[in-house]
Regions:
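Class I (Rossmann-like) S-adenosyl-L-methionine-dependent methyltransferase catalytic domain
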Residues: 30, 34-103, 141-213
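Hydrophobic, gly/ala-rich membrane-insertion helices/peptides used by toxins and envelope proteins
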Residues: 1-35
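A short glycine-rich, Lys/Arg-flanked "PGG" loop and its adjoining helix->strand segment in the class I
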Residues: 126-141
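A conserved beta-strand element that flanks and buttresses the S-adenosyl-L-methionine
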Residues: 112-115
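A short His-aromatic
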Residues: 118-122
Length: 233
């Protein structure tokens, strides 16, 4: 699927640098013991046939504000929805950002990341989600999708995680169920974010809203936001 990125090669040093400048100290303690993936291998997962999926995702985003495609792959989906781009290993085109640390904190009202997380091993995947949370503006919306059990249809060897595989071409794939993706993301981001399932965008997809208002020490939902499960048209 499109939007798949090779950001798995950020590596431990790069991830620590991102964390030191970008996220709270408590989050910096999350382990990042992951193997680096050569970009020429991870780039094999990039696809150019997912423009319709981007159109569906756009229906769930805020109508106003800037959009960032996080892990833009070939950049075709971002072009369709007029989004800025983050892609560390772009080939034959120039993204707006090739290092996530260069993206300002709380700078985008909307973020898409379609079928990116499923090609990342857990340490890098955790950091990608934390970066999306950091970059998202208060009341901003992020749409994330991943593959599901279909990843196991590829030839390869079983990975360390549930529903994961190392393919015969050397790429990593981790499938999610919708409920698993919600729980994993919510636990990682914490109570400052609302994470809900959405349907119509791949095997598993979620909508993240960054909560902005606090009253009496309790985080409250914006009454003007619709937090119910939504379906892409």
């Amino acid at each position: 699927m499109g939007g798949i990125s090779s950001i798995a090669r950020l590596g431990v040093k790069g991830l620590k640098s991102i964390l030191q400048d970008s996220v709270p100290e408590a989050i910096q303690k999350i382990p990042t013991k992951v193997k680096e993936v050569a970009p020429e291998v991870a780039q094999k997962t990039q696809r150019s046939n997912t423009v319709p999926t981007y159109k569906k995702a756009k229906e769930l985003l805020n109508k106003k504000g800037k959009t960032l495609d996080f892990g833009a792959g070939k950049g075709l989906g971002a072009k369709e929805i007029k989004a800025d781009t983050f892609e560390p290993y772009a080939k034959d085109w120039k993204p707006d950002y090739n290092k996530s640390v260069d993206i300002p904190t709380e700078s985008y009202e909307n973020i898409t990341s379609l079928n990116v997380l499923n090609v990342l091993q857990k340490g890098d995947r955790d950091q990608a989600i934390l970066e999306i949370g950091r970059i998202l503006k208060p009341d901003g919306t992020a749409i994330i999708s991943t593959r599901g059990s279909d990843v196991l249809e590829a030839a390869g060897t079983k990975g360390d995680e549930a529903m994961s595989i190392i393919t015969s071409t050397g790429t990593y794939q981790k499938g999610f169920t919708p409920d698993e993706l919600v729980g994993y993301t919510q636990d990682l981001l914490g109570p400052g974010y609302v994470v809900e399932k959405v349907s119509g965008i791949g095997k598993a997809a979620i909508k993240i809203i960054k909560v902005s208002k606090k009253y009496g020490g309790r985080i409250m939902r914006d009454p003007n936001k619709n937090y119910n499960e939504q379906r892409a048209i």
